[in-house]
Amino acid sequence: MKIFQPKIISSLKGYNGHKLLSDVIAGVIVAIIALPLSIALAIASGAEPAQGLFTAAVAGLVIAALGGSRVNISGPTAAFATIVAGVIASSGMNGLVIATLMAGVILIILGLCRAGSLIRFMPHTITVGFTSGIAVTILIGQIKDFLGLDFHGATPVEAGEKLIEIVKNFATLQWKALVIGLIGLAILIAWTILASKIKGKASMLFKMVPGSIIAVIVGILVVQFTPLKCATIGSLYPTLTGGFPKFSLPEFKLDTVIAVIPDAFAIAILAAIESLLSCVVSDKMIDDKHNSNTELIALGAGNICSGLFGGIPATGAIARTAANVKNGGRTPIAGILHAIIILLFLVVMMPVAKLIPMPIIAAILFLVAYNMSEWKSFLGICKTRKVGDIIVLVTTFLLTIILNLVVAIIAGIVITLIFFLIHKIKEKKAAKN
């Protein structure tokens, strides 16, 4: 198999009007799903809302056009939230851009070295551990906006410090913000339940319109036309404007480059794992086989472009990819169209985005955290696996919350190797006896 072989080339053979219509429908629906998520995930990452949309548009387009999967949809994901927030806090936005560019280069090198098949061998206990840890971190990070709390200063980055601030400032709770947040959460939960139970023609509404869009619309209407008022994206980001993403080179300082090297590797590894996992899932849905090395190269190019055009790290998004397939997307054209639609939203609809209430964003992220938590897998490992696997799982989980993702992954790999060596030593001793 060739190292670089974009799927768009083979996908366009025999392309016709029927396939185009299916891709257009899927592209529009996925864009509708991605819009509120991209804004929410950027905020959760400590970036500006528009940066999430820049990422979905720029990286989403590049990766779809060059990628090794027919249907993978890329953009900002919850997995990056904690690491991106940490880089911004320690090295600023300039440091994040450098880390994103470096991660892009690392991903391209991994693809050229045919490392695509190797990355999928990351132990399941480690991926479940850090994914669950990220989910808890995201949940903790959104309590402030959900309750309308005032921290009287900069919001801390570490989850433990955030919990302390939440307790200290709980008296500043705004009941109006809480009510709006609960309305949003109720809509999201009800929409999810109804989407799984309603059949027939009525089910098309729930498939085509995500609950997050309904929650956003209701939230805006409540804040604009009732006495219930709370912080909005516009009130927290008054300088937020629309328009096309602008090209900008970061300021390369040696100390900053050195400081973000571990973060760049973490971003690259995480992007590779999540994107290739998304490819594997989508392969089963459409009975196809992706080119993992091509996907890594495209992922690298997409992250480089995202960094240069004001975005944050991007990777394949499993939920958006599944929505693409379920709504008829079968070629990279759907992913490209989804990116173009988001780009158009950036140009003409940003004033509407500024009206979105922050408790609604928090509610959306609560559901994102729940969906990515893998709590069933977590409990399953604790019930059925050996003690060594449980230690790796819990250690990775706790270190992701307490310290950061880089430390968690390294610790998980080291502990896994130690238990593997102990197992091999015991096997040799048993063989001698």
What is each residue range found by the language model?
Residues 1-433:
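Transmembrane helical cores of multi-pass ion-transport proteins
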